């Protein structure tokens, strides 16, 4: 099982598994990858950062002594960057692409390396009219309509929010946005995220989907977050989700080309910085606290 997953990771990411770090960020947009490169190069220049190298797909390694970025000509299915530290406590960013099948594939295989945490940084449809484009959604529950894990983890099994992750993400949002109190709550809502397996869900007759979304009290919808959280629960990997509202299809605000490019340009940097800030905070957390007891069964021996 382990050998198979390591071989799959090398295939999908075009990087050797040895480069994977203990803190994993998932996204599905190339914009985040580009911004991560900029952050990584700046981090390498900072001799106090603790980061030692930047590894891109194709196993191209950049260090402080050789700050020449080399990119592979042929991108793999899941482009992956690693900002490494000597003890493996750096950050890996994986572009999983779109859909729950990709999310399951990535997390199935990364789980064998027993990372200390993984977070989803993606975009979502805001379901409440009071939300604005660019607002953040911190998931504290999931409506699982992604289908891909139903046989491995039945949908009747709750996927709990992990306080250690939730508090860290909220603190990171506050630090990066420099907001607090009501101003912070206004741009970051906590609630249920629905994940579906139909990218064009909004084209269907709305009676069924809208009723289920309303009954679940969902505030956002995407295609990957519930899968990543459910597989984190399944494999005992601490998980979390921070999404950014990119459209509101139920309220007439669709993701159109011009609006999307403006949105991405203004939001990507701060969203990624929040994810990185959260991971750096989790790195300082004692492992016995980070690896929550919520991830263990009553008859399981606690282990890291």
Question: Which positions does each model-derived feature cover?
Answer:
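Glycine-rich phosphate- or other oxyanion-binding loops that anchor nucleotides, phosphorylated ligands
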Residues: 63-304
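N-terminal short beta-loop-beta anion/metal-coordinating cradle
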Residues: 1-98
């Amino acid at each position: 099982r382990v050998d198979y997953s390591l071989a799959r990771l090398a295939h999908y990411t075009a990087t050797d598994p040895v480069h994977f770090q203990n803190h994993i960020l998932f996204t599905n947009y190339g914009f985040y990858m580009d911004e991560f490169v900029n952050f990584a190069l700046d981090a390498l220049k900072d001799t106090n950062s603790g980061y030692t190298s930047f590894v891109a797909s194709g196993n191209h390694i950049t260090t402080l002594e050789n700050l020449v970025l080399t990119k592979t000509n042929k991108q793999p299915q899941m482009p992956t960057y690693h900002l490494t530290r000597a003890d493996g406590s750096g950050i890996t960013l994986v572009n999983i692409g779109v859909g729950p099948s990709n999310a399951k594939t990535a997390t199935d295989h990364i789980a064998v390396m027993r990372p200390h945490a993984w977070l989803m940084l993606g975009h979502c449809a805001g379901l409440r009219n009071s939300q604005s484009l660019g607002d953040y959604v911190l998931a504290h529950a999931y409506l699982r309509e992604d289908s891909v894990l139903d046989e491995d983890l039945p949908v009747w099994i709750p996927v709990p929010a992990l306080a250690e992750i939730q508090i860290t993400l909220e603190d990171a949002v506050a630090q990066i946005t420099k907001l607090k109190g009501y101003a912070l709550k206004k741009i970051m809502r906590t609630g249920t995220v629905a994940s579906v397996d139909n990218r064009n869900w909004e084209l269907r007759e709305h009676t069924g989907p809208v009723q289920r979304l309303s009954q679940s009290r969902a505030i956002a919808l995407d295609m990957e977050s519930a899968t990543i959280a459910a597989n984190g629960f399944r494999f005992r990997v601490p998980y979390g989700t921070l999404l950014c509202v990119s459209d509101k299809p139920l309220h007439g605000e669709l993701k159109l080309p011009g609006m999307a490019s403006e949105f991405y340009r203004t939001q990507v940097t701060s969203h990624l910085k929040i994810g990185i800030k959260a991971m750096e905070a989790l790195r300082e957390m004692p492992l016995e606290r980070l690896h929550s007891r919520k991830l263990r069964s009553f008859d399981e021996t606690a282990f890291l």
